[in-house]
């Protein structure tokens, strides 16, 4: 499955103003992720990396839940990364904008979290390996993604939609 990252970046950049107004599914995902994260971590994470922070939907929940000065953000769209940091009072020096598949991550983390981002990876297996190397000894990776049958009804009705991987392809 070929992903055009430039196109993905352009589309998210263009929709950044109206994104939160239309992100009903993403908001539901974030609300379900926090309890999953809490049940997965054994201690309060000191260093947290959010991949694909976008407008900051998950960022705000992570900040509220863990009140962490060790929250680091990544997004493919540089402006979104800095916007999410500013809105959520995260140090701008904690932003790693760009394609996480290509970025060098200089730190290790207790928690790596991502909501609705991994479906955009071009090399998911390599990226999982890379991220696992950036986890502390008891670190946890928690993510959500869209799958092959996401919004199937829209595809059947309109003949259009996005192609996502099935779980075996991740």
Role assignments for model-derived ranges:
Residues 1-17:
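N-terminal, positively charged/glycine-rich alpha-helical extensions of SAM-dependent methyltransferases
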Residues 24-44:
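Conserved alpha-helix/loop element of class I SAM-dependent methyltransferases that forms part
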Residues 34, 63, 128-132:
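A structural alpha-helix within SAM-dependent methyltransferase catalytic domains
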Residues 47-103:
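Class I SAM-dependent methyltransferase SAM/SAH-binding core
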Residues 101-112:
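A short acidic, Gly/Pro-enriched loop at the edge of an enzyme's catalytic core
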Residues 111-124:
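A short SAM/SAH-binding and catalytic strip from SAM-dependent methyltransferases
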Residues 125-140:
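A short glycine-rich, Lys/Arg-flanked "PGG" loop and its adjoining helix->strand segment in the class I
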Residues 140-170:
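Conserved catalytic/acceptor-binding region of the Class I
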């Amino acid at each position: 499955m070929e992903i055009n990252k430039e196109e993905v970046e352009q589309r998210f950049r263009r929709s950044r103003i109206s994104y939160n107004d239309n992100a009903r599914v993403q908001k539901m995902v974030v609300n379900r992720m926090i309890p999953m994260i809490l049940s997965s971590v054994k201690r309060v994470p000191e260093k947290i990396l959010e991949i694909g922070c976008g407008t900051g939907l998950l960022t705000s929940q992570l900040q509220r839940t863990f009140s962490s000065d060790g929250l680091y953000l990544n997004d493919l769209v540089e402006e979104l990364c800095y916007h999410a940091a500013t809105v959520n009072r995260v140090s701008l020096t904690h932003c790693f904008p760009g394609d996480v598949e290509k970025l060098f991550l200089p730190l290790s983390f207790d928690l790596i979290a991502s909501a609705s981002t991994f479906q955009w990876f071009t090399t998911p297996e390599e990226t999982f390996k890379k991220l696992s190397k950036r986890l502390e000894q008891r670190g946890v990776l928690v993510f959500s993604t869209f799958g092959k049958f996401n919004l199937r009804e829209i595809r059947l009705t309109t003949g259009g939609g996005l192609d996502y991987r099935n779980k075996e392809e991740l």
